[in-house]
Amino acid sequence: MGSLNIQHNGYDADVEKIREEEYPMLKDSIYLDHAGTTPYPKSLMDRFAQEMTTNLFGNPHSASASSQLSTQRIQDIRLRALQFFNADPADFDLVFVANATAGIKLVVEAMRCLPTGFDYVYHQSSHTSLVGVREEARSSVCLDTRQVEDWLSGSCPFDDNEDEERPILFAYPAQSNMDGRRFPLSWSSQICRQSLSPTNKRKTYTLLDAAALVSSSPLDLSNAETAPDFVVLSFYKIFGFPDLGALIVRKEVQDVFLSRRYFGGGTVDMVVCLKEQWHAPKDGFLHERLEDGTLPIHSIIALDVAMDVHAKLFGSMERVAGHTGFLARRLYQGLKGLRHANDELVCAIYSPDPETEESGPLVAFNIRNAQGIWISLAEVEKLATLKGIHIRTGGVCNPGGIASALGLEPWEMKQNFSSGFRCGTDNDTMGGKPTGIIRVSLGAMSTIADVDRFVQFVKEFYCEDTPPILPPPETKLDPSLRNTPELFIKSIVVYPIKSCAGFHVPPGIDWEVRPEGLVWDREWCLVHRGSGQALSQKRYPRMALLRPNLDFTKGELQVTFAGDISSSPGLPSSISVPLSKNPKMYAPKKSGMSSRVCGEEITPQTYASAQINDFFSTVLGVPCVLARFPPGGQGKGMTRHAKAHLQRHQHQQPHPAVSVSTRLTKPAMMPGAFPSPKAVETPPSPPDSDTERSATPTQEAQGPKPRRILLSNESPILAITSTSVDALNQSIALLNPSVSQPISEAVFRANLVLSPSPSTPSASPSNPLTPSPSPSTTSKPTPKPKQKPKQKLNPYEEDTWSSLTIFNSSSFSSSSSSCSTPSSSGFQTTTKFQMLGSCRRCHMVCIDQTTGSKTAGGEPFVTLSKTRRFEGKVFFGVHMGLQAEDEEDGHAEDIEKEGTGMGMGTGTGTGTGTRSMGGNGSVVKVRVGDVVRPSYL
């Protein structure tokens, strides 16, 4: 073993030397997704560019000198590619295709045209592209390894009454792209012998998916008698470039393709169209009949260069296989050795042990915390991305392998689908089981440092090296000690355009709240012209530099770009759109495009103005259009609903001033409320709010309606506390001292920032474009309620809130109320909000909202992942929405009912109004400085 380590350390040292020069794109990155594709070296691209600039390559279907040069080079490269796999051109032909999947489709296209069709057998570890073949077969069956061995021993996977003339196609991977498990190449020879047996009347063909195997190991086709009939592979998995694949066909079975019906340009000698329909396929080499249209000339030329450079840099494929195998063993043992403080394994590994079973250089696994709860795949990938680690997570296009490894029965997979699971979504744990895996795969240019750094990454963020803290014993506290903290609204921020900068509501201004959220919040979005996807800062961080201003005097949304536009002379630095819903501003509905927000399809109103759309496209450098999703929409694509819900960790963290028994027995509901007099609308509100549409009798009978939202991700309103932000910054200073600047509250993009200290709003707004409030709303300070000694607000205490009550001191008027003006005792309205659950975070919090660039050290997400991860997900802040009238929780005792204008009863008494969503004639408003009182779960 010592000499083996020395040998591989020598290879590793060689790779380290060339990586800086040959793979500059790998600087500061740990690339561990070679099973997807491998990086290409710089010298390959340089030499290919030289080939293209010094030679003239023409269409090989012509007779010119340039065309003949192309034909000659293609013939030479085809032979060289066969020799790369030790395939004798006398026994094999190679057909150039786009990728392995295209090769599979070519085989299936021929098999389905056979007079009897074909039956299909495939291994459960097959790639999705092999699984899809079953849809073209007369019948199909999926077998695991034991069942394949039984079949090869004589048992037939099909009924005896099947057509004896119908051939069977057996497909399997040489190496699983999911867990790296390798399957015997001898299966092909066994199938061949069985097919030739006198007792077997059915011809069986073999299709080998070698794409995963050849990426790091040699494939030997020197024995044509035992080789598979068809082999498919992708060259980019070996060399990184070009994007090209191959179908290698054993010439003995090439007659299968005689039944293929389709023909393309260059594959026929004669075609008759008029009066008769007849054609004569080329009768020379098989590839001449199968390579439809013009070949990808330049990609084939690049393949020649790629084989040269690969051999120069890494030597033989046997040498690559030895190195990657060594790294795979190191990776497997490193992950296997990680344990929590309670001795539970950190990683559940699905790949075979490379020390005892032949497997490829990849490891498939999932991560559990010390309590055995699965860590979210999406959270792992988010954190890996921040650390410059490139891995693959999810189903990895291997449904059978995933189902087998994770113990997912068909009914469970169908149930997951019905519950909303889709490929590429964040629903990675359903029904207590993961829906995918983490895949780490190695390649020729991988190093020991790559492996060690990844193992250290898992250890640092997911290995719990201290025993879990046991919950405190149950104790019942004296009711007099159950005080709630008094909080204040420190700031109110609306984000008119989804994922762009926020508009800070000036002090002294009342801001309307509707069931769908703060008025004007996330009513617009930018939509990619091609994909229809709503743009997000996660992909386009420069969106943070688009600064909105709501100018109610002019009735405009003004957007200024705070970045550099010097490269676009003549481009204005700002643009304006009217707040009114002027139909002339929008593109005709027939050309309106649908969009997707958080996986949901919506039908926004897109703006027709080229000036508006060009402004956003230019400053962001992405083709996009401005679209609006106003409240009040009806029908498919016009409504969205909140998805936030209480998380399990919120039920497990009692408020410090509430006993465990009290917390568990108190229902998480709010007391009822009645409508307050309608407020003066300052600032103006958009029309057609959801509050203006009453529920139908059918809806009322079905119970509370789901909460409607506009373009926010999960809920109407997002809130954070300054106390939690301060605590997080203290944690960052402790865990990541290299970060010199504290994290701003702005990175969390909250609508409400709550603070235990009252703000000191100025007498008038600092924004001259915002209307000045009336004297009655600015001169009268918010009255402070009489209360018992204040309870200190602890960091992250918001996780334990069931509801919030906000005391607003605005002036209200209503013809139906005697309380048309504030009373001398200090008229206040109380607005109730229900807490909808903790906010799950992604690495978008790592974008500096001032500069549009990434924050230092991947903060705050890196520290959040260490201090705020529950059940594998990272949380910070809380979702909330207006309390519905039917959501009563009996928490009135937590809010004092003394004669202070802040009573939480029925609203009777001195100058008290209690409001919730949907009240007729009421308008809910909040302002900076309002008093906030929480109730607890």
Curated annotation (Swiss-Prot):
InterPro entries: Aminotrans_V_dom, MoCF_Sase_C, MoCo_sulfurase, MOCOS_middle, PyrdxlP-dep_Trfase, PyrdxlP-dep_Trfase_major, PyrdxlP-dep_Trfase_small. Residues 682-935 form the MOSC domain. Keywords: Molybdenum cofactor biosynthesis, Pyridoxal phosphate, Transferase. Residues 633-710, 756-795, 897-921 are annotated as: Disordered. Its cofactor is pyridoxal 5'-phosphate. Residues 638-652 have a biased composition (Basic residues). The keyword Nucleus does not apply. Residues 756-767 have a biased composition (Low complexity). The active site is at C397. Its EC number is 2.8.1.9. It catalyses: Mo-molybdopterin + L-cysteine + AH2 = thio-Mo-molybdopterin + L-alanine + A + H2O. Pathway: Cofactor biosynthesis; molybdopterin biosynthesis. Residues 900-921 have a biased composition (Gly residues). GO terms for molecular function: lyase activity; molybdenum cofactor sulfurtransferase activity; molybdenum ion binding; pyridoxal phosphate binding. It comes from the Eukaryota. GO terms for biological process: Mo-molybdopterin cofactor biosynthetic process; molybdopterin cofactor metabolic process. The modification N6-(pyridoxal phosphate)lysine is found at K237. It is an enzyme of class 2 (transferase). Belongs to the class-V pyridoxal-phosphate-dependent aminotransferase family. MOCOS subfamily. Sulfurates the molybdenum cofactor. Sulfation of molybdenum is essential for xanthine dehydrogenase (XDH) and aldehyde oxidase (ADO) enzymes in which molybdenum cofactor is liganded by 1 oxygen and 1 sulfur atom in active form. This is Molybdenum cofactor sulfurase.
